Amino acid sequence: MKQLLLQAFNLIRQNPFYATISIIGTAVTIAFVMVVVMIYDFRTMDMAPESDRSDMMYTGSGMTYRKLDHTNQNSGMGRKAFEALFSELPGVKEVTWYRGVSKTPCNLSASNEIFNYYVRPVADNWFKFFDYEFIAGRSFTQEEYDARRWVSVITERMALQLFGTTDVVGKEYQSNFFPTKVVGVVKDVNAIFQTAYADAFVPFSLENEDYYATWTGGLGGIRLGLLKLLPDTRPAEVRTEVQHRQDRLNSSTAEYAFEMNELYTHTEYTFFRGKDISAPLVYSMLLMVLLIVPAINISGMTNARMQERVT
């Protein structure tokens, strides 16, 4: 060990430039690898409220178009298409749906101060699908959901900022100028949970879903789906079954057809969603970065040996 340290010290003294590059490069590479691993773990490992990330699949928006000439294309999935493709899928434990978050003005009726919060419309089984920690109250009931009542589950941060306390079950606030009753309060959700995150959750039934389906033969809409797979189910099997169902659906429709070509695992949805991001390209770039430092080290060592022979 002592001899190795002496050799390293002599190498640094004889070739300070290459030694400095080698040390800095090695340190940067180690730090880079640690950051990549940490980001990957935080974004993909099973953590509450997204406790089943490894078993989840995400749908895209899908697309409707006129069969005759592929015109009148619109993105978005409606109730009819969603139920035809994803209801009672073999190998799927549970299915839910939602709409993306939107920044919504919220305030108390007795106050002129308006706050903007991220509000997410969700299905009636949303709080069974994810593991939120309730501080007070409950999720909205099936009756409230079906009756399209203006109720919401809000986060601790929103409750404290809006009301000054978390004891707010039964109280009302204005959500986009609609009186909304608080039925539950959950622990804050970090934005790293891209699907479970929101400041407030309201029933998806409040959305005028049928309006979006009127000009697409009932197929179009605003739903995004989530599937929770059984342990032995492979994503490829689900994709194959969904494709078969899609073919059957389109063979039974008159004017419009629906396409769902976007079914992601959690890792795919998090890092490689969309056609602009190529997984092979990302992996190749990471590999190149990891190989640069060893290449510099070898180059420095070779140059040092050559200088020794010359002298």
Give the role of each language-model region.
Residues 99, 108-146:
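The feature marks short, hydrophobic/small-residue-biased sequence motifs that occur predominantly
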Residues 14-44:
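Short, strongly hydrophobic transmembrane alpha-helices
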Residues 8, 23-27, 288-291:
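Residue-level signature of the transmembrane alpha-helical core
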